[in-house]
A protein has these predicted regions:
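Short, charged beta-turn/beta-strand-edge "cap" motif at the junction between a beta-strand
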Residues: 20-21, 43-48, 59
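C-terminal structural segments of small proteins and small subunits
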Residues: 11, 51-81
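Short alpha-helix capping/helix-loop boundary micro-motifs
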Residues: 1-2, 23-27, 38
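Short, Lys/Arg- and Gly-enriched loop/turn segments at beta-strand edges
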Residues: 26, 46-53
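Short, structured beta-strand/loop micro-motifs enriched in basic residues and often containing a Trp
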Residues: 11-24, 35, 73
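SH3-family beta-barrel domains
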Residues: 1-18, 78-81
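Conserved beta-strand/loop element in small beta-rich adapter and peptidoglycan-binding domains
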Residues: 34-42
Length: 81
């Protein structure tokens, strides 16, 4: 089931499926976030912003508004801390 990256909980894994707009796509593509890539939620700040992720072997922080524009398909296997 597709959902926004911002909806995932810490430790969850998902595959990036699409982005809502081209502006965010170019920025994220430069950081290794491309459709088909597996992404893991590492940490969510107490107020929900920013969200720390791991993608393509890199640790990145995304603002909540960026995470809301990324659509993912959650995987069955998740790594819990």
């Amino acid at each position: 089931m597709k959902k926004r990256l911002s909806e995932l909980k810490v430790g969850k894994l998902a595959v990036i499926t699409e982005f809502e707009n081209d502006d965010i796509f170019l920025k994220l593509m430069e950081m290794g976030c491309i459709p088909g890539e597996t992404i893991k939620i590492d940490q969510i700040a107490p107020l929900g912003d920013p969200i720390s992720i791991t993608v393509a072997g890199y640790h990145l922080s995304l603002r909540l508004d960026e995470a809301e524009k990324i659509w993912v398909e959650e995987t069955i296997i998740s790594k819990q801390h």
